[in-house]
């Protein structure tokens, strides 16, 4: 098993290319199940979760061909073809590796008339039920069964039917599953209180490129006119706003200057505003965003919430950054109930953090010290890397397979902007 070793204290400076978005890619990949024609995705990141999803698609009968990307951006190109659906069963041994596997449920039941999917795995950051996914499919006429750790969805005779879906709470995954099912349902589907994340906008635009008819893209009300079939397309995966935000925090915590090549301000307003409030310079340029930090960081009060508010996927990284701020910050996690597992590891390095329910009180300190720390989930892992970049001495982050699920070539990218970081084997 690998570990990341960091010798802290270097000011980061240079150009850092932003990869295609993990969360968008995992939503776009199952679109291949919606058409018998070829779907090609470009700017696809090289990540463990993306590879696992590709194996799942192969299991379902999708043929895949990968080629390498060119230029400063590092995305790959994947061509997928699902002329026929060979299987409608997504087995446990693949699905257990990542929660996003549940996103084959909607496309399979929409095109093949049925789907059997193992209940998903992924990061252990709290109770993330799929009941909203299932209720959305039921609103389109699907019959749902739960047994032996699997969920089975069966379309009525003649296929799914358009309907009205009103989400009681905002759910990104349920919105994605419902949207992919609705594009092949008969008639009109209206989705109220739909999630508005940029990754959902990316999904909707890909579906439109495949022939879907969707109104209200980017709003919380989506209206879909179902089609009997979709055609193939080529679509570019959006840049990863969470990766960009994470490396912006790396510039901030080290007092550095990094050009985030490919990052888009429209996708990151809440993140960028948080950085500005903390005293970090943000300067958009043609093709990216420059992040500059000089002097002590200022404390913040932040709450996570669905887009366009501050994203839960940036909470851990901001916590690491604010551990070095001049004053006391207050972070409140409203999305997941168990997303402070990085706190004990940060405190072992000298951070002063107290958790009270969903709220964390972060008192800035002048120095933290390198240590052996254990990654617990994807974003928590990145917070430990950020702390290691500024810590005195050597930090070793163990169980970095979590990082490999969401950050492409992390140690290479950080090394290129001046970090003393390397991947080693735990032996």
Curated annotation (Swiss-Prot):
The keyword Ribonucleoprotein does not apply. Phosphoenolpyruvate binds at residues 22-23. One of its GO terms (biological process) is UDP-N-acetylgalactosamine biosynthetic process. The active site is at 123 (proton donor). Pathway: Cell wall biogenesis; peptidoglycan biosynthesis. One of its GO terms (molecular function) is UDP-N-acetylglucosamine 1-carboxyvinyltransferase activity. This is UDP-N-acetylglucosamine 1-carboxyvinyltransferase. It comes from Rhizorhabdus wittichii (strain DSM 6014 / CCUG 31198 / JCM 15750 / NBRC 105917 / EY 4224 / RW1). The gene is murA.
């Amino acid at each position: 098993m690998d570990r990341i070793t960091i010798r802290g204290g270097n000011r980061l400076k240079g150009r850092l290319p932003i990869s295609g978005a993990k969360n968008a890619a995992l939503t776009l990949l199952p679109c291949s199940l919606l058409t018998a024609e070829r779907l090609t995705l470009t700017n696809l990141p090289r990540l463990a979760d993306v590879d696992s999803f590709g194996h799942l698609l192969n299991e379902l009968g999708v043929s895949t061909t990968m080629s390498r990307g060119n230029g400063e951006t590092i995305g790959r190109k994947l061509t997928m073809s699902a002329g026929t659906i060979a299987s409608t069963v997504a087995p446990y041994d693949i699905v257990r590796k990542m929660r996003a596997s549940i996103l084959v449920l909607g496309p399979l039941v929409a095109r093949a008339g049925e789907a059997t999917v193992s209940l998903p795995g992924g990061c252990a950051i709290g109770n993330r039920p799929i009941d909203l996914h299932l209720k959305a499919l039921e609103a389109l006429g699907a019959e749902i069964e739960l047994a032996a750790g699997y969920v089975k969805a069966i379309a009525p005779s003649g296929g799914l039917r358009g309907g009205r879906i009103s989400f009681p709470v905002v759910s990104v995954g349920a919105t994605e599953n419902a949207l992919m099912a609705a594009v092949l349902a008969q008639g009109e589907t209206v989705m109220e209180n739909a999630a508005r994340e940029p990754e959902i906008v990316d999904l909707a635009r890909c579906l439109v490129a495949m022939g879907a008819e969707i109104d209200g893209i980017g709003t919380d009300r989506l209206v879909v006119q179902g089609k009997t079939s979709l055609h193939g397309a080529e679509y570019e995966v959006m840049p990863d706003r969470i990766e960009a935000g994470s490396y912006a925090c790396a510039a901030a915590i080290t007092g550095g200057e990094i050009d985030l090549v490919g990052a888009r301000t429209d996708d990151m307003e809440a993140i960028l505003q948080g950085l500005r409030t903390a005293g970090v310079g943000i300067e958009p340029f043609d093709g990216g965003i420059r992040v500059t930090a000089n002097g002590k960081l200022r404390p913040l009060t932040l709450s996570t919430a669905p887009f366009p508010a501050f994203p839960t996927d940036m909470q851990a990284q901001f916590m690491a950054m604010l551990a070095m701020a001049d004053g006391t910050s207050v972070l409140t996690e409203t999305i997941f109930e168990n997303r402070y597992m990085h706190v004990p590891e940060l405190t072992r390095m000298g951070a002063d953090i107290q958790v009270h329910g969903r709220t964390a009180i972060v008192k800035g300190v002048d120095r933290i010290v390198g240590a052996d720390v254990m990654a617990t989930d994807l974003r928590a892992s990145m917070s430990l890397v950020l702390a290691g970049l500024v810590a005195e001495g050597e930090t070793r982050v163990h169980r970095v397979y979590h990082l490999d699920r969401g950050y492409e070539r992390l140690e290479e990218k950080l090394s290129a902007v001046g970090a003393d970081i390397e991947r080693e084997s735990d032996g």
